[in-house]
Amino acid sequence: MKTDYLKFVKWSNEDDLYIGYCPDLFIGGACHGRDERKVYAELCRLVANDLQRRKREKQPLPRREAIVAMHLAV
């Protein structure tokens, strides 16, 4: 099974922060911060750690099912 899960960072006006998401592994936001690049780097670290833990504990990897749709204003 492939381990390239969808990861993205989104600005939250409500929180006034960037929030990092990986919907197939974590419910809701996994990390947050004011610097978009740092949030993405932290998200990648969290995903890698979670996948290593699952492998070490012989847990099955979740299916990659996340789909992101964007509404584009014209």
Language-model regions: role of each:
Residues 1-8, 34-37, 41-74:
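Short, charged, surface-exposed hinge/linker loops at domain edges
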Residues 27-32:
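Short, well-ordered beta-strand elements within core beta-sheets of diverse protein domains
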Residues 10-26:
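Short aromatic-glycine-(Arg/Gly/Cys) micro-motifs in beta-strand/loop hairpins
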